[in-house]
């Protein structure tokens, strides 16, 4: 699932930051951002306008956190993005199980 891969990318970015591997960090964050952009692009505003608007705001926040982590070389924004996307992934899994 995309949410799991997002978490893997953020974990790799954290490891890369600790190792001062700027290229590895950038590659991992770039891939995580691509996942969020694809999720955002898949929103069907005609089918569920309010839900999609809320998810779009969450995705924009996550993208901003990833950008901060990438630019400032810090882990806390990665942790915020990871936590939020994990919660969304859990919600999607629960909804799918119904």
Language model segments and positions:
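Amphipathic, heptad-repeat alpha-helical segments
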Residues: 29, 36-37
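Solenoid-repeat scaffolds in large eukaryotic assemblies
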Residues: 25, 32, 78-81
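Amphipathic, coiled-coil-like alpha-helical segments
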Residues: 78-98
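Short, solvent-exposed, charged loop/turn and helix-capping segments
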Residues: 38-53
């Amino acid at each position: 699932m995309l949410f799991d891969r997002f978490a893997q990318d953020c974990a790799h970015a954290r490891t890369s930051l600790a190792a001062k591997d700027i290229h590895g960090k950038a590659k991992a964050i770039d891939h995580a951002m691509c996942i969020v952009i694809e999720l955002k692009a898949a929103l069907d505003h005609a089918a569920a306008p309010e839900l999609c608007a809320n998810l779009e705001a969450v995705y924009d926040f996550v993208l901003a956190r990833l950008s901060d982590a990438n630019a400032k070389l810090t882990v806390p924004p990665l942790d915020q993005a990871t936590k939020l996307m994990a919660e969304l992934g859990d919600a999607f899994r629960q909804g799918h199980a119904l």
